[in-house]
Amino acid sequence: MALRAGEHSQEAANGLKEKVLTLDSMNPYVRRVEYAVRGPIVQRALELEQELRQGVKKPFTEVIRANIGDAQAMGQIPITFPRQVLALCVHPDLLNSPDFPDDAKRRAERILQACGGHSLGAYSISAGVQMIREDVARYIERRDGGIPADPNNIFLSTGASDAIVTVLKLLVTGEGRTRTGVLIPIPQYPLYSAALAEFNAVQVDYYLDEERAWALDVAELRRALRQARDHCRPRALCVINPGNPTGQVQTRECIEDVIRFAYEEKLFLLADEVYQDNVYAESSQFHSFKKVLTEMGPPYAAQQELASFHSISKGYMGECGFRGGYVEVVNMDAAVKQQMQKLRSVRLCPPTPGQVLLDVAVSPPAPSDPSFPRFQAERRAVLAELAAKAKLTEQVFNEAPGIRCNPVQGAMYSFPRVQLPPRAVQRAQELGLAPDMFFCLRLLEETGICVVPGSGFGQREGTYHFRMTILPPMEKLRPLLEKLSQFHAKFTREYS
């Protein structure tokens, strides 16, 4: 446990030299950083798991971590072909094994030829293996209907988070009323608030419309921008599509409106598109900001600055631990792009295993390849099950009194709104907790279900939510949803 300020004098009294680095002397901006997805509730979940291993009796037999979008931690089986290619790259002696298909061997040989010393253990260039960047560019071109993508505008990264933080770092400048402001959606993914706190930038909240399935309204963007200009200099706008934690998928019309707004107000656009393969609602379709921007033509296509992000952690692969991703920049100033390259160089290079898996993600087996039937079957099975889980989650929550869940159109989460009795709110305040944090802690202690309170993502005053992944196996998901709904009913009776 960290020392509090008043404990330093006790050190001196004991004849110990005061530490150079203390809570008082450390970077104050780091102290302000919060990351709810791995916050106090998750720490308590770890403690409960340890207690269960030690034989301590609980009202449950396991902790179900529905707090984070980690598919394989929740039981998803890895897709075979990417792992075969990775195994061959890590241990090239396996290239002589009859246990691996020929197309996986060809892919591994091609990747190894592009690596320094023909080994995955060598550093790549800081922007990532050039051949893989070229494959990413071809993927983007296919995705966007033939719109060109330049590999020199693509930087591979240690997951999308690493790239997002890099771009934010480029944007942050100024002091006082000239500090950089960044518009982020509320509810938001806490990476953004954490990074802005660390960089001493200003978080400018714009609220998604819960009554319209978490729609993004340009009128709300204008309100947020107008108020922010009184105390900072807004320079960037972030959009998460499909949404995290809210699961909505933006329409093309909405994206066009956002691009016009950003252009008119001279805002750099950050498009967090890591869930682009996770679209479940039949009425929804993913549209990339790059494609829409280009098809809008001048002046937007040639002038609006954009950084778009993707990752191997989500989609159908769920390879979170290998940390692979990329950012594509559009219309970025050439001198700034050089500075971005410099920042990447300081970090040496993204992990090469993550780069390998990214290459397979953007260039999967073709229909003529021997691995295609199995790959396609596994991919479709994962996405079909996620779609079924999204529908089930919405259905069960909306049948429970006091819980309302918008359609989970995409991504990997539901973000239901829960009604909490006034006495529960009062009790939470007495304990110094946010009301939904109090609810989620009680839920964890009594059921073993670990979810993240909505206050960790931001929400309108007087509303309470939690984020829950839809990733648990179907045989566990329905009982989990029913148990959670039953707990809410019990909690409501207790505090009514």
UniProtKB/Swiss-Prot annotation:
Modified residues (Phosphothreonine): 22
Cofactors (names): pyridoxal 5'-phosphate
E.C. designation(s): 2.6.1.2
Sites of N-acetylalanine modification: 2
UniProt entry tagged with the keyword Cell division: no
GO cellular component terms listed in the entry, alphabetical order: cytoplasm
Keyword Repeat attributed: no
Positions carrying N6-(pyridoxal phosphate)lysine: 314
Localization per Swiss-Prot or TrEMBL: Cytoplasm
Domain of life of the native organism: Eukaryota
A Gene Ontology BP annotation from the UniProt entry: L-alanine catabolic process
Family indicated by similarity: Belongs to the class-I pyridoxal-phosphate-dependent aminotransferase family. Alanine aminotransferase subfamily.
PANTHER family: ALANINE AMINOTRANSFERASE, ALANINE AMINOTRANSFERASE 1
Functional description taken from the UniProt entry: Catalyzes the reversible transamination between alanine and 2-oxoglutarate to form pyruvate and glutamate. Participates in cellular nitrogen metabolism and also in liver gluconeogenesis starting with precursors transported from skeletal muscles.
Protein name, UniProt field: Alanine aminotransferase 1
Organism per entry: Bos taurus
Protein's gene: GPT
